[in-house]
Every structure is written in C-alpha cells, then in structure tokens.
Amino acid sequence: MISINNIAKGFSDKPVIEGVSAEFETGKCNLIIGASGSGKTVLMKCLVGLITPDAGEIMYDSENFSLMNTEAKKIMRRKIGMLFQGSALFDSKTVEQNIMFPLDMFSHDTRAEKQKRVDMVLDRVNLNGAHKKFPAEISGGMKKRVGIARSIVLNPQYLFCDEPNSGLDPQTSLVIDKLIREITTEYNITTVINTHDMNSVMEIGDRILYMYQGKKEWEGNSKEIIFSKNEKLNSFIFASDFLKDAKDMRMLEVSGKIDEKRNMDQLLNG
C-alpha cells in the first residue's frame, strides 16, 4: 500500500497540488483522474520521486519515502515499475534489448537468468516472437505491451502507469486495460494509473482519486462514481467522450446491477 498525507507542491510560489491525502491499495488498480492542469501528473511525479513535494508524507508500506536520503530512494526505485505515456522505448534497440535494459542496469543475475526473465515477461504480454523486432516495426498497442513487459521485468512491488491508453484505439485500450488488471492481480502489486479515460475508470478502477485544481475533490470506486452527487466530478464525467456510450450494457455490467438502468436513464436524461 502507498499512503500520502497532505502532499503539497508549487512552482514559482504558485500552488499546483494542495494538501492531498489518499491511500493506494495493494493488488488493486488505483486511478488518479482529472482534467488537464488538475495536478494529477505532478502528484504522480511526487510519488515516484521525480519531484520533491514541498510538504507532506509519502509512505511505501512501512517505509517513509519522504525522509529517505538519495541513496535510499535509489534502492526504493528498484521496487517501482514505470509505464510511460509514450512507451519511451529506445528506437535503436530491439524489443528484447529494451526489456533487458533495466536488468542490465540493476540486476546482478547471470546473462542466462536475465534472458529467462525477458522471455517470461514477453510471454506474459503475448509478444512471443517479437524479440528481434525494432519499435518502428511494431504497432502502438505492441509498443505498450513492450513497455508493460519492461516495467515488470524487475518484479516491482509498485507499478505506475502514465496515460497508458494514450494514442490507442478503443479496442486496443481495452486489451491494455485488461493486461494491467491481470498483472496487478497476479503479481499482487500496488498499481497507480494516471488517466483521463473514463472507459478505463469503469473497466479497471478499484479505487479512484479525482483531482480538481490541485486538490482531492472526490475518492471512491467505479461503482460509486456514476451516481456521485459531486458537481465538479459530474461535470468532468459529462465532458468526457465516455458518456456518448453511457447507456450501453458494458457500463451497466461494470456497475454490477442491471436493474439500475432506470436510475442511469434518469441520471443521463434528467
């Protein structure tokens, strides 16, 4: 579990996030959502140590990340997997070499052990046979899967995903969501996802933190979010493309209650 308490960060005396407290549960997909400029990206960067907060406390289970020195933070980061928005693959390296990179940086295993690990994670993300391909030779969805494989190759305890569905079509996004969900459960890791994709929220959002103008505005789960009475959250939901398909059965199935269609229609139509 990751716990944050009263996290604050500003730039040039302008506050960007103010007094944010939340818990991100182990074995769950914890989503941070909000409009552009809401502070969700800065919050995630604080969580992984790319930015130092001005105030507040970050706890990784029983370890206080906020009080760690530089060397201790380096050790902690080895327990963290990162899936970047643009996949951040090395164009000059093959798929295999991209995934091997963290192992070469941080692992003392033999070359054979490293290769076995690379083969295993490639198999897990259904990319057998792609070892020798270069990023330019594979699709956007495959690049995301390479990014996921690289993010878990060191057996992290914590996984951070920054806009994992950015640039993907809806069907591929669904595949990536499902893969992140499966890996979170199988590895029993704490997964934190920064997204504005409401389909992802409904598909895999175990816990949801909604940010508004640098503050925590709402916290709950995907079964509660559609029926929330929070006006700012509802405005964010109604502004998303998600509501174009909000009456489909997928949404009702996610809520777990087919008989709530009447409530859904009332919410959408007034």
Regions of interest found by a model, annotated:
Residues 48:
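Helix-to-loop junction immediately C-terminal to a conserved catalytic motif
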Residues 134-138, 142:
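Conserved ABC ATPase signature
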Residues 56-64:
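Conserved ABC transporter NBD signature motif
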Residues 159-162:
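Catalytic Walker B motif of ABC-type/P-loop ATPase nucleotide-binding domains
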